[in-house]
A protein has these predicted regions:
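Glycine-/charge-enriched secondary-structure boundary and capping motifs
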Residues: 4-5, 9, 13-31, 80-82, ...
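Gly-rich Lys/Arg/Thr-decorated short loops/hinges at beta-loop-alpha junctions or inter-strand turns
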Residues: 66-85
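Structured alpha-helical segments in the cores of large, soluble enzyme domains
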Residues: 1, 85-100
């Protein structure tokens, strides 16, 4: 049984802001409060990678697009009028999978893919855990993909993706 506290009717999102340096990207934010049945277990799963040899995986459906990303912003690419459409059913499946794996004690770490995309999230996990990561992008390819092919996957900021780590057996579950 999940209970939620609601701030219904209390919303303030401004999609037009300016500063002396130019427009500020729109940033709608949703905050929620809920009950966690086993808060100690949830708190034990941080963003930092924990052990050498753990498997690292992405949970969620990648949407290869740099539209509205930090990388596009750094390159001076104007904010597009449309962004990739989120598949909310897929996002919910990814969130449910991560939640269930945390509850089962299967994950050593979990981190959302947000600002900066997949590669920035990996770097944040490495820094938080004071441990490196070895990544292989050739799996399932006859030849290694080019950087141009990988870039939207590495730096895209599509909603609903997570980096998780744990034992290989736990990750494969």
């Amino acid at each position: 049984h999940e209970e939620w506290l609601s701030g219904a009717g209390q919303a303030n999102v401004s999609l037009y802001n300016q500063s002396g340096h130019g427009p500020i990207y729109p940033t709608p934010v949703v905050g929620m409060v809920g009950l966690i049945p086993d808060a100690a277990r949830a708190a034990a799963v941080g963003i930092g990678f924990r052990e050498e040899g753990h498997a690292i995986a992405m949970c969620g459906t990648p949407q290869p697009s740099l539209a509205g990303s930090e990388l596009a912003k750094l390159r001076g690419v104007p904010l597009p009028t449309t962004l990739p459409q989120a598949d909310f059913a897929a996002v919910k499946r990814a969130q449910d999978a991560v939640r269930d794996a945390v509850r089962a004690g299967d994950l050593a770490s979990a981190h959302d893919i947000a600002e900066g995309g997949f590669l920035v999230a990996i770097a944040e996990c490495c820094l938080a855990g004071d441990i490196g990561a070895k990544l292989d992008f050739t799996s399932g390819h006859d030849a290694p993909p080019s950087y141009a092919e990988l870039e939207p996957y590495l730096f895209g900021e599509a909603v609903g993706g997570f980096i998780v780590s744990g034992t290989r057996e736990a990750i494969e579950r």
